[in-house]
């Protein structure tokens, strides 16, 4: 088989399964409205959960940062790319979340890959929730360590896997709020079992940070859990992009020596760090509380109105509200019908989710209004 035949076969298989991904160029993709092909849609696909992507103070902070620092960092943080703006953001994040140190990364994917690649050796074992994000599972699969997956949120199964003899160290990996189901991991129980087996816990709280918990500190804070490794990202609740790893001082020093994504990647622009500092300030103050409270009300309104639809509504109290449709083609058709009626939604299909669980991944944000939720419900009931 030639290279071209290999590529064609893979694409043909995706098309046959109604699983071929495609991108839509949009004029605006975050916030309450999505604009594409000169048409405006109510946007129920964005991860901009607090509606901060268009916040004037955050935009102004980025603009002022670009004027002060330029539009790029100029290099890796190990050379010339670690600015006073990066340092200030790291210190503010560490203080906010109660850790000694924070290290910035260009994306959550990079952060997860970097930590696992740097921490794990052949004699070690990763025990991961089987529904963990692709970045976590891919990093675990590529690492030299053993990978075992436990049934989603099943602490008993986790304990059984941890009890199996391991010559090295064990790292338990999970999300805080799961990206495709919207449910929250039982972190207190997971941490207890992990500690009983002398393991470390790594939590990717991409979809919880900024959005839930006191001052938006996320799912770990909400459950009074402090994992050894906490990954937070800035493309969701913060409304920007990037990520950070929260950890002890010694682990931070270790990652600075051995995390190749840090050493060999150009760091985020200092102007972006300034925007993230402004976003964090909004998240922590009363305005952040008001946005989170509004989001909770919108979620309650949606869940109350969707109960009698002929779809499975995931057990989620987060901004992620998946409607499980099942069949790939049906999910695609339903998403298209909703778009035709002014609601932009995304059909998520395998391999992103398990086979037979194709869904509409609906996301609600604080930028929405109650009438937006009512319109979504009206359209869903008309196509159920």
Curated annotation (Swiss-Prot):
Reaction(s) catalysed (UniProt annotation): 6-carboxyhexanoyl-[ACP] + L-alanine + H(+) = (8S)-8-amino-7-oxononanoate + holo-[ACP] + CO2
InterPro entries referenced in this protein's UniProt entry, alphabetically: Aminotrans_II_pyridoxalP_BS, Aminotransferase_I/II_large, AON_synthase_class-II, AONS_Archaea/Proteobacteria, AONS_Proteobacteria, PyrdxlP-dep_Trfase, PyrdxlP-dep_Trfase_major, PyrdxlP-dep_Trfase_small
Pfam families on file: Aminotran_1_2
Amino acids binding pyridoxal 5'-phosphate: 108-109, 179, 207, 233
Enzyme Commission code: 2.3.1.47
Cofactor(s) demanded: pyridoxal 5'-phosphate
PTM sites of type N6-(pyridoxal phosphate)lysine: 236
Keyword Transferase: yes
A Gene Ontology biological process term: biotin biosynthetic process
CDD domains linked to this entry: KBL_like
Enzyme kind, highest EC tier: transferase
Source organism, top-level taxon: Bacteria
Annotated residues for binding of substrate: 21, 133, 352
Keyword annotations of the record: Biotin biosynthesis, Pyridoxal phosphate, Transferase
A GO term, aspect molecular function: pyridoxal phosphate binding
Pathway stated in the Swiss-Prot or TrEMBL entry: Cofactor biosynthesis; biotin biosynthesis
Family stated for the protein in its record: Belongs to the class-II pyridoxal-phosphate-dependent aminotransferase family. BioF subfamily.
Function: Catalyzes the decarboxylative condensation of pimeloyl-[acyl-carrier protein] and L-alanine to produce 8-amino-7-oxononanoate (AON), [acyl-carrier protein], and carbon dioxide.
Complex formation: Homodimer.
Protein name in the entry: 8-amino-7-oxononanoate synthase
Underlying gene: bioF
């Amino acid at each position: 088989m030639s290279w071209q035949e290999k590529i064609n076969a893979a694409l043909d298989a995706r098309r046959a399964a109604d699983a071929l991904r495609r991108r839509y160029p949009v004029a605006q993709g975050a916030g309450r409205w999505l604009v594409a092909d000169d048409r405006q849609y109510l946007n129920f696909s964005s991860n901009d959960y607090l509606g901060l992507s268009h916040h004037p103070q955050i935009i102004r902070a980025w603009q002022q940062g670009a004027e002060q620092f330029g539009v790029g960092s100029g290099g890796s943080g190990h050379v010339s790319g670690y600015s006073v703006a990066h340092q200030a953001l790291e210190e503010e994040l560490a203080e906010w979340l109660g850790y000694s140190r924070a290290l910035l990364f260009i994306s959550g994917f990079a952060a997860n890959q970097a930590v696992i690649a740097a921490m794990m050796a052949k004699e070690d074992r990763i025990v991961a929730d089987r529904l963990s994000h692709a970045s976590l599972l891919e990093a675990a699969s590529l690492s030299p360590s053993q990978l075992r997956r436990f049934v989603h949120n099943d602490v008993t199964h986790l304990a059984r896997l941890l009890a199996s003899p391991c010559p090295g160290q064990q790292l338990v990996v999970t999300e805080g709020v799961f990206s495709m189901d919207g449910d929250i991991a039982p972190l207190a129980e997971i941490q207890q079992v992990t500690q009983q087996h002398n393991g470390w816990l790594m939590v990717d709280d991409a979809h919880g940070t900024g959005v839930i918990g006191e001052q938006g500190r996320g799912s770990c804070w909400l459950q009074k859990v402090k994992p050894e490794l906490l990954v937070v990202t800035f493309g969701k609740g913060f409304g920007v992009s990037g990520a950070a790893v929260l950890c002890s001082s010694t682990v931070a020093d270790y990652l600075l020596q051995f995390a190749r994504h840090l050493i060999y990647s150009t760091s985020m622009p200092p102007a972006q760090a300034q925007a993230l500092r402004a976003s964090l300030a909004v998240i922590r103050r009363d305005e952040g509380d008001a946005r989170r409270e509004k989001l909770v009300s919108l979620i309650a309104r949606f869940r109350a109105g969707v109960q009698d639809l002929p779809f499975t509504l995931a057990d989620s109290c987060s901004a992620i509200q998946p409607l499980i449709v099942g069949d790939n083609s049906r999910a695609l058709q339903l998403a298209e019908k909703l778009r035709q009626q002014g609601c932009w939604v995304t059909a998520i299909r395998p391999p992103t989710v398990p086979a037979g669980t194709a869904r509409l991944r609906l996301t609600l944000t604080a930028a929405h209004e109650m009438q937006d939720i009512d319109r979504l419900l009206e359209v869903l009931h008309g196509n159920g």
